[in-house]
UniProtKB/Swiss-Prot annotation:
Belongs to the gamma-glutamylcyclotransferase family. The active site is at E55 (proton acceptor). Transmembrane segments: none annotated. Coiled coil: none annotated. This is Putative gamma-glutamylcyclotransferase BH1612. Its EC number is 2.3.2.-. SUPFAM superfamilies: Gamma-glutamyl cyclotransferase-like (SSF110857). It comes from the Bacteria. GO terms for molecular function: acyltransferase activity. Keywords: Acyltransferase, Transferase.
Amino acid sequence: MRGARCHNRRCYVYGHLYDSGLGYPALIADEKGGKVVGELYEINEQHLVSLDELEDYAPDRNHNLYERVLHTLEDGSHCYLYVVTPDSPLVRTLIPSGDWLDWTENKKSTE
């Protein structure tokens, strides 16, 4: 995301992170879940449009693979999350650590 400013390379939301089996993760947001690691960026409207296109998300469409939700972080700031529902076909293998980057590195080292 050219021009987007990274505020935090290791921040957290609560939920369950899954390996979709397609090379990217899927998040179920759940305040009772474990910590899920992410990055926080300051973006503009064009960045948001680009992210929506990347995630194949359309605000006016009834059936998206992901839903974009506004989330409040522990410090009171807000961010958007792209989340799935528990019945999503992307919910495959639970990532117990909640850390996608660690998960993919560990998978590479065991293959």
